[in-house]
Amino acid sequence: MKLVIASVISLLSFSALAAPEGTLSVHILNQQTGLPSPGVQIELDKQQGRAGSISPPVKRMPMGGLNRSIRRRRIVEPGVYKVTFKTGDYFKSQNMNTFFPVVPVIFNVTKQNQKLHIPLLLSQYGYSTYRGS
């Protein structure tokens, strides 16, 4: 029994020493209601080269509110990225018009395996974003 416990502890310790994985998490808060905005689709793209072209999306996923993480090895590399929040369908589902049907946020990853958080505070006619923690 002691051998089994020691083996499990050693495996847990080994996994803690494994290479860290960078993450990007986002959340979308509707400032008019004070509630998360479920169903907003996001895309993550990495900029390639100096011409400013954007590679095909790395990840697409519907948003269910707070702290949805996008985890892919390609996002942990330093570079310029763009996360696009497709807000038009969300507002349409709420029977509301919006001036910003798409909100692109371009940001710079400066270190390998960084943990990043990008909040989006959203209303029909405006938005705000910042580097979260």
Please give the residue ranges for each predicted region.
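Beta-strand-rich domain onsets/edges
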Residues: 3-38, 46, 128-129, 133
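Feature of secretome-associated and extracellular-like proteins
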Residues: 19, 78-133
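Beta-strand signatures of extracellular beta-sandwich domains
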Residues: 41-45, 82-84
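Short Pro-Gly-centered beta-turn/loop motif in secreted/extracellular proteins
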Residues: 67-80
